[in-house]
């Protein structure tokens, strides 16, 4: 990360407009956009933190504010997480669906052009963004959102829950998220893992720094390869010497690559 490498996580973000999509304290979104009433191309951002309540949407407010200055309407999703009532399985995942569906009712009020949208998620939020577009339609599967983006950007996403379980990432956080191991909760892993539901069927870019020591780059090399073989339009961008947080730091050298991938509003 640039300058003080913890600044994104510790500095309050520029304010946004808070809109609730449910009754729980964490069921809300933060909307930031340039002044004016015109409908703008919309970026939906899902934050990471390995699904734990210690991390919230505040730290992605910096990148959302930066993109708003560049002409985007941005929406940072908050959701119930491990450690909160209703968090973990299935509430963490169903909150993302509920938040995305709620945006259809907020679009006119805030000038959100959902027909020209991108979804972007970082780390565990990358998992949730990928999950939302790869939802199974099998009977009994978790509810999928009612609309899809034009483009999906995964920033060092946790793209394979079974692999995350095998590697015991972040003190074996998948046990907390899914209530057991992949062997013990096979159906939940199958329903919740993007890698189990390829192809994505949306243009996708995965950005993963070569110095990331939080989510293994090998996981996304494999995921992108499998998605491409399944017929997806997907590519992997690997910024040299970038760590796990450089990709969400608007002061980092890597940020220009993220902006370029998103394109012009």
Can you say where each PLM-predicted feature lies in the sequence?
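C-terminal catalytic histidine-bearing segment of alpha/beta-hydrolase fold enzymes
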Residues: 214, 221-265
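Structural cue for short, hydrophobic secondary-structure segments
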Residues: 45-48, 76, 206
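Primarily recognizes the serine-hydrolase "nucleophile elbow" in alpha/beta-hydrolase
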Residues: 101-167
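Short, surface-exposed "cap/lid" segments of acyl-processing enzymes
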Residues: 35-39, 43-66
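N-terminal cap/lid segment of alpha/beta-hydrolase-fold proteins
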Residues: 1-37
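Mobile cap/lid helix-loop segments that gate and shape the active-site cleft of serine hydrolases
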Residues: 8, 163-196
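Catalytic nucleophile-loop/oxyanion-hole region of alpha/beta-hydrolase
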Residues: 55-64, 75-116
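Short beta-strand/loop motif that positions the catalytic acidic residue
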Residues: 200, 206-208, 212
């Amino acid at each position: 990360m640039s300058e003080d490498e913890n600044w994104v996580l510790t500095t309050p973000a520029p304010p946004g407009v808070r809109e609730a999509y449910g009754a729980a304290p964490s069921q809300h979104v933060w909307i930031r956009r340039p002044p004016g009433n015109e409908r703008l191309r919309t970026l939906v951002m899902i934050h990471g933190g390995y699904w734990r309540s210690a991390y919230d949407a505040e730290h992605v407010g910096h990148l959302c504010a930066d993109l708003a200055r560049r002409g985007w309407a941005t929406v940072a999703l908050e959701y119930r997480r491990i450690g909160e009532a209703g968090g973990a399985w299935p509430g963490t995942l169903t909150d993302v669906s509920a938040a995305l569906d709620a945006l259809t009712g907020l679009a006119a009020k805030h000038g959100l052009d959902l027909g020209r949208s991108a979804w972007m998620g970082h780390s565990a939020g990358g998992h949730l963004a990928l999950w939302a577009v790869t939802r199974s339609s099998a009977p009994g599967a978790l509810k999928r959102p009612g609309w899809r983006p034009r483009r999906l950007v995964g920033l060092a996403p946790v793209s394979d829950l079974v692999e995350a379980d095998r590697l015991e990432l972040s003190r074996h956080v998948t046990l907390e998220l899914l209530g057991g191991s992949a062997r013990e909760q096979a159906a939940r892993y199958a329903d919740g893992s993007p890698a189990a539901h390829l192809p994505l069927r949306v243009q996708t870019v995965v950005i993963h720094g070569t110095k990331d020591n939080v989510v293994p780059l090998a996981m996304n090399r494999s995921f992108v390869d499998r998605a491409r073989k399944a017929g997806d339009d997907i590519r992997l961008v690997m910024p040299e010497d970038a760590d796990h947080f450089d990709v969400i730091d608007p002061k980092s050298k890597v940020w220009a690559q993220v902006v370029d991938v998103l394109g012009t509003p």
